Structure formats: C-alpha cells, structure tokens
C-alpha cells in the first residue's frame, strides 16, 4: 500500500515555480506521503480511487503567508481541490506540518464547497468558515489523529482560541455521535 500512496502523492505534488534543494523537496514529499499513510483506509480510498480530485502545489510565500489552504472549484462533473502549501510551511516541525495537511484532507473529505458558494454576508460567511474548520478538525479527531490536529492548532492560534476551538470540536463530535 505504501508504494500506491507514494505514487499517488508524486503524481499530484507540484513544486513548479520554486527553486529548492533536492533534500527539501524529498522531505516535503515524505511528509505528505506520511499524512496519507495515517488516514483510515476508507478515507484514503476516496483519494486513491479518484472520488476526491486533488492536486497539491507548493507555492511561493505571498506577502502574508497562510501556511496551507484548500481551494475548491466546481467543474461540470465534480469538485476539484487544490491544496496550496506556502513555501514557509515546508520549514515547520513535522507534526505541525502533518496536522495542517490532515486538516486540509478533512476539508476535502467533507467536500469543502467553492468560495463562491459560501454565504455572502460577512457575519454568515465568518460563521460558515468557522463551522467548516470545526468539521475538518472533528474529522481528523474521528480518524484517531487528534494529536496532530492539536499540535497544528497550538502552533497556529493563541491559547484562548485553541480552547474555544477544542470546545467547538468536542460539541460537534457529540452531535456527530463520535467518541473523541
């Protein structure tokens, strides 16, 4: 199975436009492969069988780097996902990086809609964004990978936000009927 995952990631990972040393490229590939290896089989198969159309791009840091973000586009037949990973994220500690990738895979598993399908009003849009982030986190937790998500959250947000996010995830998991 590891060979299948490795081939899948290599076909989807795009470093174009960035100049890196070979060791940095190999380290990033290895980390992305490890994230996929941690997925439960039924979730992994969504990617391997093409049910989730994914490309992964390593991009130059914008003026305000965002770490990682999934962009969704709707084609005539399906949702197409692009996981953009800013160059800076390649330097993150491995568990932080894995937590971030797993969270993005949670978005894709949950079929994150394109931005233009989100609510238009500012408050409603913010609440929607918060709910989809929480859903992605809850999925990662339900996969038994809470520790990676917690590392990502604590490296990314102030502690008082992490407390709120953890509470929201716990509440969502209760409504989903899943154990933490």
Regions from the PLM with identified roles:
Residues 1-8, 109:
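N-terminal low-structure segments adjacent to metalloprotease catalytic domains
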Residues 8-17:
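A short aromatic-anchored loop/beta-hairpin motif
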Residues 16-78:
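Auxiliary, metal-adjacent structural segments of Zn-dependent hydrolase domains
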């Amino acid at each position: 199975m590891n060979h299948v995952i490795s081939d899948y990631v290599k076909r989807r990972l795009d470093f174009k436009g960035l100049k890196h040393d070979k060791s940095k490229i190999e380290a990033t590939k290895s980390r992305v492969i490890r994230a996929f290896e941690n997925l439960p089989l039924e979730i992994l198969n969504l990617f391997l069988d093409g049910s989730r159309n994914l490309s992964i791009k390593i991009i130059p840091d914008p003026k305000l780097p965002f770490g990682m973000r999934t962009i969704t586009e709707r084609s005539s037949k399906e949702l197409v996902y692009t996981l953009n990973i800013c160059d800076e994220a390649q330097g993150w500690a491995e568990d932080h990086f894995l937590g971030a990738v797993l969270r993005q895979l949670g978005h894709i598993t949950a079929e994150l809609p394109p931005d233009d399908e989100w609510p238009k009003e500012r408050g409603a849009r913010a609440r929607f964004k918060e709910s989809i982030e929480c859903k992605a986190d809850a999925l990662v937790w339900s996969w038994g990978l809470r520790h990676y998500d917690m590392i990502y959250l604590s490296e990314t947000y102030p502690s008082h936000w992490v407390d709120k996010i953890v509470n929201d995830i716990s509440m969502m998991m209760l409504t989903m009927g899943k154990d933490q």
